[in-house]
Amino acid sequence: MATQNNHKGITRRRFLSGLAIASAASVVGTSLLAPRKAMAATDAITGFNGEVLCGSHWGAFRAKVVNGVWTETTPFEKDPHPTVMLDAVREVVYNPARVKYPMIRIDWLKQGYKSDTSQRGNNRFVRVPWSQALDFFQHELNRVQETYGPSALYAGHTGWQSVGKLHNAGTMMKRGISLHGTTLGKMGDYSTGAAQVILPYIAGAMEVYEQQTSWDIVLKNTDTIVMWGTDPVKNLQVGWLVPDHSVYGSYQQLAEKVKNKEIKVIHIDPVRNETMKFVGGEQLPVHPQSDIPLMLAIAHTLYTENLYNKDFIANYTTGFDKFMPYVMGETDGIVKTPEWAEKISGIKASQIRELARTMAGGRTQLVGGWCLQRMQHGEQWAWMLVVLAAMLGQIGQPGGGFGFGWHYNDAGTITSAGPLMSGFSGVTGVEPIYNGSFKGYAKTIPVARFVDCISNPGTKIQWNGSEITFPYMKMAIFSGNNPFAHHQDRNRMIKAWTKLETVVSIEHQWTATCRFADIVLPATTTYERDDIEQFGNHSNKGILALRKIVEPMFESKDDFDIFRELCARFNREEAFTGGKKKMEIIEEIYNGARLQGRGIGVRMPTFAKFWEGDGYIEFPAGKEWVRHESFRNEPDLEPLGTASGLIEIYCKTIADMGYNDCQGHPMWFEKEERSHGGPRSDVYPLHLQSCHPNNRLHSQLCSSTDFRATYTVADREPIYINTQDAAARNIKSGDLVRVFNGRGQVLAGAVVTEDYSPGVCRIHEGAWYSPLDGGKAGTICTYGDPNVLTLDIGTSQLAQATSAHTAVVDIEKYTGPVPEVTGFNGPTYETGIDPLFPAMDK
């Protein structure tokens, strides 16, 4: 049964706007509408006509509702630079991939945990009543805990989910499942897994999610900005909370200063990215995965030309004397000269020296992204960026130093003077029903190694200074999470998946993770429930009511109600809810911020006035801020969180771990595979980038049918390829191509462009896995999931993070029968099956 298509037709103007989303002009809009009063949540009922204020990862907006149907979306007037992705948000509610009903995989319904798990992915499901689905869920929780213990139950995989302080899918899952029993958890994430482990050792904090120096200060004080593997104009369209997009005004000012030659911007990137197109500047098209040789050569130049800051090195760092012998070749016989680096990086020695001199010749801000730490030995890049900033000696000064979060969460905006809201957290003081022993197995695992854990139970690995033993995972629960998008080496993952006895997915879109689940429960979208959220991420500009726009579609339920009903089955309903209804919790969250506001002089209206009124409060402006300023001004009183309190160029803690792939100081390690003359480039000559998309948030919005049509090529995810590489393969823009390596193959639509250096191609991550032969490892992906092609190995023994950007491929024009894209139509409904078949008794 298909969702009724109530979508309004997309005009040519809107269509072209979607096509142009990759350009900065389409990202940065103009001021919008005059304020309008939002409606109360109680009005969001069938037959309602009016406007509703709400928010999303893509910004705040007003939804026009006609006879209970959401028909139009208008950006919130407080957002000066809304993203075109707001056009796709309505389709999250209305699209063929909605999870409509509780569904059970057909063979699991027949045989329970003894089912033929090789059938997972064939997309054959049976609709069942909610009561039966939740009974199955509880039965499996009990069975796994009683049969194997907590180490066999994995309920730690969380991700972006949806905005809202109450309806956080991961929090709901952890709160509900932890009342039932302890489970295997995870550490780290896929975005910053390597950097977030190593940087606390080196710089004393995780750094990747931190607020950055205020842009006003940078624009006043900086001479040179080095953007290293980052594309903030593309990535700032989305936010962890509801972005206000005010930061784009700073990029407009930067573009003007670059144009007037007041600030120099240097982009170290093999791609002429959206930020470069928007702000201007110079490009150094470094070969992929060769940034460390380039950085070491810069360090060599700073040292040999006496351009480094000796006072800063002496007073704010430790270990420089142990690092420089490596740079000078005294430890391995290789002097890290610009000539040495040129052969690997493709950047001329003269350019490397000039770059070092430019960086040392004035105030320099190093702006690092996250892609470069998502490759094998990714820890080294994060470490080395801090080392270069230390050698320049400008850390803690206005407009100088380093930062790893400029492309994320409105970074560089001035944080308001307002309070912060809490959320719906875990339960304390209530003993779980099942609290068994882990029997020596790990209680947590590095998240990017969870498929390793499934594949190789009992294996011991090194991780961040400890040895852990993978448990025998038997059941996995995913709520608002799509590992069949963000994990690497899809075919390896499919093979591992057969070892799981039961998989539960709680979702509102029928993702590939649902296809490979046994129990699928339909959740509401953000737009079918009431909630509250912060407007602006680092800016904390205000508080926004997230009002229900339409009634829940089909049989979807809020995550709150799903886990409340599950907890009722084991007598923990009141512990889960805290004895409160959903709106009472939202009011409690608001009142907590209101009380906090009183203490800092910020007056807020009562919750009733807020919710029934405009549904938006704006906080007073805060003050400008310089990252690491307190450390620079008073290093003894404000030390970093490292072992020494200083920046650790050489880290004894890491050295003492004894890892050969992450030693006591930053080093160059060759990769398993690398383009431009590296390993396996003779077989697969093209480096595959799988960066964050400019049309989605990871895999979110990929199911928005009309919006997807504005950027697909030949109905597939685009692959961007250099003109020389395309000509050598007789490929033109618009061609359907096969992208392949030894791990798998995908179809994609070619976009031939000079923006990409020779030997470099890109498919944005988050493209939905759409197998030709569902559930079969090795089958071609009909839409273009890049993680069919990526390598699933840890960055090193330190972080064990994802190495997605260590991947080489080849491309050819596709000449076979053209298959339909399989990924966006929901499940195959099997009928004639008794929906009350007692699989739990098997």
Task: Give, region by region, the residue ranges found by the protein language model.
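N-terminal export/assembly segments and adjacent metallocofactor-ligating motifs
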Residues: 2-307, 566-568, 727, 771-842
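N-terminal leader/propeptide and maturation segments of large enzyme subunits in energy/redox metabolism
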Residues: 108-132, 307-348, 436, 549-648, ...
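Extended redox/cofactor-interaction regions of prokaryotic respiratory oxidoreductases
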Residues: 169-256, 261-268, 292-296, 390-515, ...
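Long, well-ordered, tryptophan-enriched scaffold segments
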Residues: 259-267, 271-361
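Flexible glycine/proline-rich, aromatic-decorated loop/lid segments
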Residues: 274, 512-545
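Short beta-alpha connecting loops at secondary-structure transitions
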Residues: 280-285, 541-552
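Active-site phosphate/pyrophosphate-binding segments
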Residues: 298, 319-450
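Long, contiguous, secondary-structure-rich segments that constitute the structural scaffold
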Residues: 549, 558-610, 683, 698-699, ...
